[in-house]
Curated annotation (Swiss-Prot):
Protein name: Uptake hydrogenase small subunit
Function (record text): This enzyme recycles the H(2) produced by nitrogenase to increase the production of ATP and to protect nitrogenase against inhibition or damage by O(2) under carbon- or phosphate-limited conditions.
Binding positions ([3Fe-4S] cluster): 271, 290, 293
Binding, [4Fe-4S] cluster 1: 59, 62, 156, 190
A GO CC term assigned to this protein in UniProt: ferredoxin hydrogenase complex
Species of the source: Rubrivivax gelatinosus
Entry's Gene Ontology molecular function annotations: 3 iron, 4 sulfur cluster binding; 4 iron, 4 sulfur cluster binding; electron transfer activity; ferredoxin hydrogenase activity; hydrogenase (acceptor) activity; metal ion binding
Example GO biological process: anaerobic respiration
């Protein structure tokens, strides 16, 4: 199988453009310029990796997102970087012909292909709600048997998502509960950001290993910070400036959306840094709060427009009287607590004083 560099040269791409591509790839992955030679070497020497993409219960939004990646472009990822040999949504072949391709790749590249799963397998009724040549739970286990890693695309494969919402009649289940003996990289989101999807694949192909994961199995390079941490509306949150309803003056001023349900403070994703549509925007920038779609169980945690909790802070708009009065109250409470603690400590160290206090009472 050809290397990525050989494919690019065959397509008439110059060495200069190739190195520029490697530099942009390093930037998109958040890597230092010193990694560019490593990326170039990997793309020059390593053959393209076969990818088998299975679909479960889903809406195909992950595929829709993937094909809109700006860097790398989906066409470069599919036609040059990886060898997407099986994807029953995108491939031309169907039926027995498609199944023959799947079997051929599994046998020919045993231990060297990546399994990507979009959607989740249903366990109720022996998996009859999602059937290819066999129920998806068994099909996924069979394809995973000789893969080197599994990528769980989206919140469906990662957590279960809306198919697993209560009462979950199909028993839709995240893929890590069906495939238990392989490393699984979770890329949650409904859907995930396009550049996050292609970035994970690029990292795996470049360094021939899975990216560093957090405790939940998500790549730290994209899921180590809350959306709230880098949100451009964060200064309004800190200042106590909030939208109270979507049609008020504060909404027009671009104030923080926390009080109208934004889940950014509890959601780990790269939306506020990578954004969507080639870095054009993301939901909060468009005026709608984060729904927390990359977090486990978001679909059963109440309305998207309910605030997480009440917060009590002054912000820069608070009056001096309010701040001073509250501060005085806090200081008074602290003095009373300190006095009580001092009495208790003195009595505990002076038995006679304790006896005298008891006799007086």
């Amino acid at each position: 199988m050809e290397t990525f560099y050989e494919v690019m040269r065959r397509q008439g791409i110059s060495r200069r453009s190739f190195l520029k591509y490697c530099s942009l790839t390093a930037t998109s992955l958040g890597l230092a310029p010193s990694f560019v030679p490593q990326i170039a070497h990997a793309m020059e020497t390593k053959p393209r990796t076969p990818v088998l993409w299975l679909h479960g219960l889903e809406c195909t939004c992950c595929s829709e997102s993937f094909i809109r990646s700006a860097h790398p472009l989906a066409k470069d990822a599919v036609l040059s970087m990886i060898s997407l040999d099986y994807d029953d949504t995108l491939m031309a072949a169907a039926g027995h012909q498609a199944e023959a391709i799947l079997d051929e790749i599994m046998a020919k590249y045993k231990g060297n292909y990546i399994l990507a799963v979009e959607g989740n397998p249903p366990l109720n009724e022996d998996g009859m709600f999602c059937i290819q040549r066999q129920a998806l739970p068994r099909e996924a286990q069979a394809v995973a048997a000789d893969c080197k890693a599994v990528i769980a695309w989206g919140s469906c494969a990662s957590w279960g998502c809306v198919q697993a919402a209560k009462p979950n009649p199909t028993q839709a289940t995240p893929i890590h509960k069906v495939i238990t003996d392989k490393p699984i990289i979770k890329v949650p989101g409904c859907p995930p950001i396009a550049e996050v999807m292609t970035g994970v694949i690029t990292y795996m192909l470049t360094f021939d290993r899975i990216p560093e994961l957090d405790r939940q199995g998500r790549p730290k390079m994209f899921y180590s910070q809350r959306i709230h941490d880098k949100c451009y509306r964060r200064p309004h949150f800190d200042a106590g400036q909030f939208v109270e309803s979507f049609d008020d003056e504060n909404a027009r001023k671009g104030f923080c959306l926390y009080k109208v349900g934004c889940k950014g403070p509890t959601t780990y994703n790269a939306c506020s840094t990578v954004m969507w549509n080639e870095g054009t925007s993301f939901p909060i920038k468009a005026g709608h709060g984060c729904t927390g779609c990359s977090e486990d169980g978001f679909w059963d945690k109440g309305s998207f427009y309910d605030r997480l909790t009440n917060i009590h802070q002054f912000g820069i708009e608070a009056s001096a009287d309010k701040v001073g009065g509250t501060a005085a109250g806090v200081v008074g409470a602290a003095i009373a607590a300190h006095a009580a603690a001092s009495v208790i400590k003195r009595l505990s160290h002076d038995p006679d004083a304790a006896a005298r206090a008891e006799s007086r009472s």
